């Protein structure tokens, strides 16, 4: 295993063994380049390229490091527009899943923040023995807690038997924005507004992801056809279990609007304690009617 702290000497306070981030963006880039170069003797190195701003910066740094690596993009089938095209521009190998997201909904139901089986099925697959990822602690409070130690720059995944490395772990949003602007990096089109201004605070992700909260709802407002397709496949799942169309819609509406409250409330949805007509909520927020959804139910695949 690599001695992580020796690769990042400027980040460590030797007196009390605490990690203090006091580097400029360019110094952090140099440290990341040095770290990636230390992996150069290893074989079968890949870079997970999501087409987001972080993987764009990581791709640039890996190129600067001069090592051989293979950029790989996992298609989720509910990616934002232009995502696959942007990955192809970076020479990525495009990996498509055996089952689409809609297939997974029909097979396993709607994903929730408590049960995100779609991530494991569509994203967390074996790619290579050594994998570079653009994960940053700064992205969320949860990740800050999860990757609190410098040793977390390296992690071995037993699920997919892959050594995972996070060269951008201590980059913050300012570092990412500075790197993109200083080195004139082209980012995914959705990071730019109509005037061409770059917005580092924007995030790419699967359309309608339950972890995105209000943004997930806005995604479906912008993509109502996808929401109808998700509903139809979810209805097939619930009907296979002996439930009704209303049960399926109730489940999805709760996942979109209420499941962030607490797990107890989530469990109560199947005990008749949810007193709002879910079709009414769909009509109000997405202008989707019951007839539009039920009229075009596909044939079951499972």
Regions found by a protein language model. Give the residues of each.
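Glycine-rich nucleotide phosphate-binding loop and flanking beta-alpha elements
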Residues: 138-139, 187, 215
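Extended serine/threonine-enriched, polar tracts that run as long, contiguous segments within proteins
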Residues: 182-189
């Amino acid at each position: 295993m690599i001695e992580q702290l020796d690769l990042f000497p400027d980040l460590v306070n030797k007196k009390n063994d605490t990690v203090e981030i006091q580097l400029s963006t360019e110094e952090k880039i140099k440290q990341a380049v040095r770290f990636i170069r230390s992996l150069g003797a290893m074989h079968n190195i890949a870079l997970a390229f999501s087409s987001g701003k972080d993987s764009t910066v990581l791709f640039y740094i890996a190129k600067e490091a001069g090592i051989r690596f293979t950029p790989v993009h996992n298609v989720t089938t509910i990616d934002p527009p232009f995502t696959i095209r942007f990955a192809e521009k970076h020479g990525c190998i495009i990996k498509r899943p055996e089952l689409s997201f809609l297939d997974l909904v029909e097979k396993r139901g709607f994903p929730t923040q408590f049960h995100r089986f779609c991530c494991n099925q569509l994203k967390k697959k074996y790619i290579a023995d050594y994998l570079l990822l653009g994960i940053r602690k700064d992205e969320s409070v949860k990740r800050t807690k999860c990757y609190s130690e410098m040793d977390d720059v390296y992690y071995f995944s037993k699920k997919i038997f892959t050594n995972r490395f996070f060269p951008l772990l201590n980059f913050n949003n300012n570092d990412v924005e500075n790197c993109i602007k200083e080195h004139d990096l082209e980012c995914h089109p959705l990071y730019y507004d109509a005037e061409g201004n770059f917005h580092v605070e924007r995030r790419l992700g699967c359309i309608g992801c339950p972890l995105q909260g209000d943004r997930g709802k806005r995604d479906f407002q912008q993509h109502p056809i996808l929401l109808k397709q998700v509903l139809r496949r979810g209805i097939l799942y619930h009907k296979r279990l002996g439930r009704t169309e209303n049960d399926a819609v109730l489940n999805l509406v709760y996942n979109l609007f209420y499941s962030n409250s607490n797990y107890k409330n989530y469990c109560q949805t199947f005990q008749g304690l949810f007193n709002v007509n879910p079709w009414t909520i769909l009509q109000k927020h997405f202008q989707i009617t019951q007839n539009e959804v039920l009229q075009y139910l596909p044939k079951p695949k499972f």
